[in-house]
């Protein structure tokens, strides 16, 4: 189980996260929706250990990553919105870096993301969509129990987008927890839980209220 309690964060005098809380159980997929600049990416960076919060607590599978930073590495996979890859390195070398060792990634992972023939290719030679695939593969290379994804289907063609969503269902079927941001209606409606971020405050949308009109109303500044 994942428990996020009262996470806060400020940049200077601007508070961008205001006592954000959520929880997730094994096999759940959670989506967070909101306007650009509302705090979604900041929250995901904190949950992935890429940024420290000003306050609050995290509990991942009974461990506290804010007290023991190695928990982030053991428990989390992170796919940021921006390209996290090192362009001057090959696909294989990037995957080895993300896997924290020099072993080759397993074949099933390479087949899933269709990277078998690209391992020696420099990332700088790849298209935006292919870079996204490599980023996704890097995010799951350590087989994390908690997968954090910032708009994971951005830059993917419609066919591969569907393949990724089918893969996520299998991941959830193995008790994996997915937390992702999205602007896509289908992804919002398919999730187990939906939250809206507005000006640093996180609102949970009840299943009976989950429709695009309600979600759009929540995103509007009061």
Regions of interest found by a model, annotated:
Residues 136:
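Hydrophobic anchor residue at the start of the ABC signature
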Residues 122-129:
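Conserved ABC ATPase signature
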Residues 147-151:
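Catalytic Walker B motif of ABC-type/P-loop ATPase nucleotide-binding domains
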Residues 103-119:
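Conserved ABC ATPase "signature" region
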Residues 56-67, 71-72:
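Conserved ABC transporter NBD signature motif
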Residues 48:
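Helix-to-loop junction immediately C-terminal to a conserved catalytic motif
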